[in-house]
């Protein structure tokens, strides 16, 4: 065995117990003491090592998306979009790429029930020949805020109160009363889709706007959509109470059991694209993450399919240590000027460095499957074997060179440095259109959830009035019904 290239693996376990350094352990049942009943000796290194390792088994949980489940599989291109992108893994129909996917709830802690009303994370890591691509999205196509400056405040509002450690509706209602752009997202969250039946029966969305670039350098703005082949199914409120009371890990269990039984979940990938030269033609800003792109004027285009056919081998190694970041892209896919995406580019990598350390991309689940090379050396928990003498660039003693230049969006940007909101806010139209698309029973369930949320005794008359005004601007009848059930007069 080459000691410099050996990597610890359960596949090379010895037949007897050892310490972490490989020394044999002849007794893993009793501590070393002075006599049968005497005190424990500090020299019992195996005991100290065992306790110290146990004390450090847990790492900081994710500040959001803490509760999650992962599975592995492949993505296969089914339709040619090479005219839109030069991304290698999308180069032709039939091309397959290994993936790992993590589904999650967003707000609540690691051990919370999977039946709570909450957005669901839908993150996909593609292990391509040109490096990894992380498509980090949710099961809802829009978001609560359009500017990442408000993200920490938003999460604080959703998280338990720093005083009571309980999630409290009045805090959420208060914060979002200052952000009417959130109404479109709430038209999803307070709808039936706010509690998916399980992970197999929910959609996924890239949420943010990205950019596709073809080999000629032509860019197109793009939105990504995952559609489950088994359909979208949800839990109503009373069903969620029953299911959650029976098994608080029902979605994880369903995913694991389905794959183990050979009933592999599958999603179709679709995209919507907009020529950047045409982005001013709409009554909304295509870079506004609180808006969807209407499918009747920007149709879905099929791209491929994703099949999850293998359960993870170890929850900690392939779920807790699994790390996503929207900044991780490949040639042919680029960012856009979406304000929330621009913020996520920094924040995700930063939180992974906090959670897992500066070398988190060396962990097997996060490392690319292709060859890679740079001078990002050393740091805490660096376990890459290196024997180079040159750790700088350029050098006449190292043949490493720059890669071929890849196309990036050829935009010329001008403007003053300023902090401002976008021109086309249009906060109410799409939320109202979505509400009117519900059948009467679904509308009533949506209405009742808002009545319950606004009935919190800490919510003031002023706050209720603001929300009635907001929903009235989305749909007059919805505002009237909400006011009636709350015994208030609608105020436009």
Curated annotation (Swiss-Prot):
Q: Which GO terms describe its biological process?
A: circadian rhythm; hydrogen peroxide catabolic process; regulation of cellular response to heat; response to abscisic acid; response to absence of light; response to cadmium ion; response to heat; response to hydrogen peroxide
Q: What is its EC number?
A: 1.11.1.6
| pH effects | Optimum pH is 7.5.
Specify the inducers: Abundance in roots follows a diurnal oscillating expression pattern peaking during the night period. Induced by water stress and abscisic acid (ABA) in a concentration-dependent manner. Activated by salicylic acid (SA). Repressed by ABA biosynthesis inhibitors nordihydroguaiaretic acid and tungstate under water stress. Induced by high salinity (NaCl) and hydrogen peroxide (H(2)O(2)) treatments. Triggered by zinc oxide nanoparticles (ZnO NPs); this induction is reversed by sodium nitroprusside (SNP, a NO donor). Repressed by cadmium (Cd). Inhibited by heat stress (HS) (e.g.
The source's superkingdom equals: Eukaryota
What do we know about this protein's activity with respect to temperature?
A: Optimum temperature is 25 degrees Celsius.
- Region Disordered, as annotated, extends over 1-20
Molecular function GO terms recorded: catalase activity; heme binding; metal ion binding
* UniProt main location, coarse: other
> Sorted alphabetically, which PANTHER family does this protein's record hold?
CATALASE, CATALASE ISOZYME B
Of which family is this protein a member? Belongs to the catalase family.
Q: What does this protein do?
A: Occurs in almost all aerobically respiring organisms and serves to protect cells from the toxic effects of hydrogen peroxide. May prevent the excessive accumulation of H(2)O(2) during water stress in response to the accumulation of abscisic acid (ABA). Involved in the modulation of ROS levels related to root growth regulation. Required for pollen viability and floret fertility upon heat stress (HS) by detoxifying reactive oxygen species (ROS) and malondialdehyde (MDA) accumulation in developing anthers exposed to HS.
- What this protein is called in its record is Catalase isozyme B
The gene name reads CATB
């Amino acid at each position: 065995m080459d000691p410099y290239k050996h990597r610890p693996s359960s596949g090379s376990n010895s037949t007897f117990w050892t310490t972490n350094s490989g020394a044999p352990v002849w007794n893993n049942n009793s501590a070393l003491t002075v006599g049968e009943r005497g005190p424990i000796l500090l020299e019992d290194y195996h005991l100290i090592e065992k306790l110290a390792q146990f004390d450090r088994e847990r790492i900081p949980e994710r500040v959001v998306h803490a509760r999650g489940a992962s599975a592995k599989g492949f993505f296969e291109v089914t339709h040619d979009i090479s005219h839109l992108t030069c991304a290698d893994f999308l180069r032709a129909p039939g091309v397959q790429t290994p993936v790992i996917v993590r589904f999650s709830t967003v707000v609540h802690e690691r051990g919370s029930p999977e039946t709570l009303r909450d957005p669901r994370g839908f993150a996909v890591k593609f292990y391509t020949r040109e490096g990894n691509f992380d498509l980090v999205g949710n099961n809802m196509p829009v978001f609560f805020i359009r500017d990442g400056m408000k993200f920490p405040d938003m999460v604080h509002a959703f998280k338990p109160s720093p005083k009571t450690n309980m999630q409290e509706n009045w805090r959420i209602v208060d914060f979002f009363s200052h952000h009417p752009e959130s109404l479109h997202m709430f038209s999803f969250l307070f709808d039936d889709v706010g509690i998916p039946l399980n992970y197999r029966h929910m959609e996924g969305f890239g949420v943010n706007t990205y950019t596709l670039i073809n080999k000629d350098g032509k860019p197109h703005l793009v939105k990504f959509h995952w559609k489950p082949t088994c359909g979208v199914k949800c839990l109503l409120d009373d069903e969620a109470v029953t299911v959650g009371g029976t098994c608080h890990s029902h979605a994880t269990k369903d995913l694991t059991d389905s794959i183990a039984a050979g009933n592999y979940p599958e999603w179709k990938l679709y995209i919507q694209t907009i020529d950047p030269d045409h982005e001013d033609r709409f009554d909304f800003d295509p870079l506004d993450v609180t808006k969807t792109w209407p499918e009747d004027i920007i149709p879905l285009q099929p791209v491929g399919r994703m099949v999850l056919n293998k359960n993870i081998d170890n929850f900690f190694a392939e779920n807790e240590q699994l790390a996503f970041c929207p900044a991780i892209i490949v040639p042919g896919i680029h960012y856009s000027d979406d304000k929330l995406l621009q913020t996520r580019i920094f924040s995700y990598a930063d939180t992974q460095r906090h959670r897992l350390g500066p070398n988190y991309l060396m962990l097997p689940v996060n490392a690319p499957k292709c060859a890679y090379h740079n001078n990002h050396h050393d740091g805490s928990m660096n376990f890459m074997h290196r024997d180079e003498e040159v750790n700088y660039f350029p050098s006449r003693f190292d043949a490493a060179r720059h890669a071929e230049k890849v196309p990036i969006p050829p935009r010329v940007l001008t403007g003053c440095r300023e902090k401002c909101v976008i021109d086309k806010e249009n906060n109410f139209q799409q939320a109202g259109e979505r509400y009117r698309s519900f059948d009467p029973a679904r509308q009533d369930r949506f209405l009742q959830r808002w009545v319950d949320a606004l009935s919190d005794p800490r919510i003031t008359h002023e706050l209720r009035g603001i929300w009635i005004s907001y929903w009235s601007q989305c749909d007059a009848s919805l505002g009237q019904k909400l006011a009636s059930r709350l015994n208030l007069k609608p105020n436009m």
